[in-house]
Every structure is written in structure tokens, then in C-alpha cells.
Amino acid sequence: MNYYQIDSKNINSSKYEMPHTIEIVNDETLKYIESKDSDIEVFLQNQSNFYAEFPDISLGNLIDRDDVVDYMDVSPHCSSIKAVVSNKVKKILESLSVNPIEYALKEIRIKGFHDHFYLLFVPIILNKDYYFPECEFVDIFDESKKYTFKDVDEYNKNDNGFLTLKHICLNEKYKNYDLLYPREGSVFMSERLINEFDNHYIWALCT
């Protein structure tokens, strides 16, 4: 299966300089995020509980835009919350029978808009599941600088904190996944999911 990073594959994207962003504003959600996501290592050990116990409904404001789109950034940062998505995106995920273990959705109500929107959670994949010889990393400041490593030990010795995955290869467990979120990169989407977004004119700004 072919995959695309959503920051390198436009999905009927507008050409604004900055993405549409939804700011979470309700205290319950903000306090929950602060209490559960202050330490990434602790978070990674409790990902499934994080989704299950997350508030069922959050409140948000659209920042510096007149209208919403189907795929938006979210603020503040929270591990594995990758976007705010429309009901249209939700229906596509369901129609393709994307495995529920690949994502979670929680409702967010956006001030001034009556449409249904959701926080999209994608579980973080740890590098123990990478097949390193076929993974390609690039420098976040200069993507012409490309790196490959024979294993996780070699990666750890050479990681300067500025490397991100550009091409990913995982073990067999993930071969039919549509959504992949490696810890050292951004979200990858399957070609069939991207194509379905194109077919349904999903209006998005890639993050």
C-alpha cells in the first residue's frame, strides 16, 4: 500500500499561508490534556486510556478565519490529536471501514458553526516497529539531507533532534493500515484514503 504524508500531498487545499486552526477553549478538556500529556513517555504507555477517558464533547473557536474547512489544525498541541475534521471526513473513514484501532474521534463544537466536527486522534507508532533499512529520514531544515539507518541503535546514535521520517516501512502488523503516525514524523495516509478525499472534495489545509 502506498502512503502520503499529509504535509506533502494536498487534498484540494487552499493556498493560505497558515492552516485553519481550531483552539480548544473549554476548561475540562484543557485540564485533561495538561494532566495527561505533560510527559510523552507516560502518555505513550497510556494511549488507549487517554482516548477512552477524554471528554466526550469539547468546545473550540476558529482562529482568524471566516469559515471552517474539512480538515483543520488544533491548538494547543496534544500528542496524537492530529486534526479537527468534519462529519464528511468521519463518514469517509466509516465508509472505507478504516479499522477503529487506527483512530478515535471525539466531538468538538465550534463557536458560531452548527456543523458536526471531531477531534481526530491517531495512535503514535514507536520506532521499535520500524523496518529501519527502508525508512528514509530527512533534516527538517533541509530536506535535501537524507538519512537511512540499519537499526534503532544506529538511529539513536545519530539522531540530532532534527530528523523526521519522509518514507516509512513498518512491520507486518501495519500492512493494511490507512492511518500511520510514527513518533518521528507526521501522519501518513493511504493512497485509497487520499483518493477518497479527492473524490469527495474534502476541503483541507495540510498540516
Where do the PLM segments sit?
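Phosphate/anion-contacting hairpin/loop surfaces
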Residues: 1-207
